[in-house]
């Protein structure tokens, strides 16, 4: 008899996979993920599926948005740019947290959720999802 998987099963599987990728990042480049480690993570195709670069440029952001991953072309193989608000260029620890959150878009595309992003980022940093979420809220509050 075939097992019928639900949408919830799919979401849980995606979140677990994102968390495992975050844990791999921490194992390989941690335990402290700083700016240099982030740049190495972005080059590592076992962790980040497609080429990815970071640009401190608000042109790719919506009003009030801290960061956003945008495809460089029609095909994922053309890579992605993670736009981070220039305000955070002088705050590497914040920029790292913002970039990690965006990596689920690079790895999973539009299927990724905020829960997936929090799972990956918190696992990479070795903190709880609540602590990661709270830190992102504090970072975002700096733009207001």
Predicted regions and their residues:
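Acidic, metal/ion-handling microdomains and their immediate structural contexts
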Residues: 9, 105, 109, 123
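Post-HExxH zinc-binding segment in Zn-dependent metallohydrolases
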Residues: 110-144
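Active-site scaffold of zinc-dependent metalloenzymes
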Residues: 55-92
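A metal-dependent hydrolase signature that marks the N-terminal structural subdomain at the beginning
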Residues: 1-65
């Amino acid at each position: 008899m075939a097992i019928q998987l639900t949408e919830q099963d799919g979401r849980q599987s995606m979140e677990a996979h994102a968390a495992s990728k975050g844990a791999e990042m921490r194992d390989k480049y941690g335990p402290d993920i700083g700016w240099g480690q982030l740049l190495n993570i972005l080059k590592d195709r076992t962790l980040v599926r497609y080429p990815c670069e970071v640009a401190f440029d608000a042109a790719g952001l919506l009003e009030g948005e801290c960061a956003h991953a945008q495809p460089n072309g029609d095909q994922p193989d053309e890579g992605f740019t993670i736009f981070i608000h220039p305000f955070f260029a002088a705050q590497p620890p914040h920029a790292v947290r913002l970039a990690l959150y965006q990596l689920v878009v690079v790895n999973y595309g539009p299927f990724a959720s905020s829960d997936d992003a929090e799972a990956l980022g918190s696992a990479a940093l070795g903190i709880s999802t609540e602590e990661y979420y709270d830190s992102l809220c504090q970072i975002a509050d700096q733009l207001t």
